[in-house]
């Protein structure tokens, strides 16, 4: 038996992990905004309230999207309280240890990229949250739009904790979803886990 290894192929595959760049400048913020408005299929809004940390995503030396976390939701989803076995008051007291994966938008479909990005985001989120806000980040929650199954989150071992009842009919101006049924699935992941 004989074997050969092609070092040129190995070299080509060295940078197969996505790189997340912390958004700091106005130019980078404009790029994030443009990606969301152009490519996010069901909530093409760049607006958010409260804390926020965004990253631009590069894969094989090409810009392929953005991902961001921000302040969690208040009032807290009942399923989250049940899952963590805490009261609304306990959640309020530890509010700054929760983040919401407020946006995740990829420009291209690349197999397994979404899961790799989520892992990188989790590895960076707690560090950046502590640096920027001086709070420990314990959980990241996300909401998945109706008609989507959250496959990328499931592949990264996030736990589906429930389903929302939708949004109120009066839809306050801060709500960015199309209708009261658009917001459905909720997933949560303790940060830094690598299962």
Outline where the language-model segments fall.
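Intrinsically disordered, low-complexity and often Lys/Arg-enriched segments
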Residues: 1-4, 193-195
């Amino acid at each position: 038996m004989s074997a050969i290894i092609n070092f040129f192929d190995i070299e080509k595959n060295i940078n197969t992990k996505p790189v997340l760049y912390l958004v700091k400048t106005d130019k980078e913020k404009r790029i994030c905004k443009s990606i969301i408005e152009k490519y996010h299929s069901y909530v093409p809004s760049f607006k958010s309230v409260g804390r926020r940390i965004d990253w631009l995503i590069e894969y094989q030396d090409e810009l392929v999207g953005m991902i961001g976390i921000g302040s969690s939701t208040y009032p807290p989803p009942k399923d989250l309280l049940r899952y963590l076995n805490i009261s609304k008051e306990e959640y309020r007291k530890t509010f700054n240890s929760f983040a919401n994966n407020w946006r995740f938008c990829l420009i291209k479909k690349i197999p397994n990229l979404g899961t790799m990005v989520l892992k990188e985001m989790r590895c960076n989120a707690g560090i950046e949250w502590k640096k920027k806000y001086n709070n420990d980040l314990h959980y990241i929650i996300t909401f998945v739009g109706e008609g989507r199954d959250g496959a990328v989150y499931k592949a990264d071992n996030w736990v589906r904790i429930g389903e929302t009842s939708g949004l109120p009919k009066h839809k306050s101006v801060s709500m960015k979803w199309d209708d009261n049924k658009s917001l459905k699935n909720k997933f949560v992941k303790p940060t830094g886990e690598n299962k």
